């Protein structure tokens, strides 16, 4: 009798399967990657020397990206730099990204919060807020 009841309960509730999905094929991975790659992310700030920095990050779904930086002094002189990188989600919760610029040069974006056209994170330990455009 006990065995029959156990079999009946097992067959009656097949949809109660509890799973934990991690990796590149999960819905959360696809949603967060799609959101990240749907925008150019920009930030600007002044450093301790009065130089104005403007940065744009572009992420592509194939794991590549571009980092555009423009630095301008008080007299209006400026320099521009464009770097390419490969990127990947660096944790199973999709809150950290590793940027590989090549030659052993890495940057890390941690504690990422995405939403409402903003990406807030710690970029190499410094709190930053990128806005989408």
Question: Where in the sequence are the language-model features?
Answer:
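Lipid interaction determinants
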Residues: 17-84, 91-133
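Sec-dependent signal peptide recognition
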Residues: 1-6
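C-terminal motif of bacterial Sec signal peptides marking the signal peptidase cleavage site
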Residues: 12-15
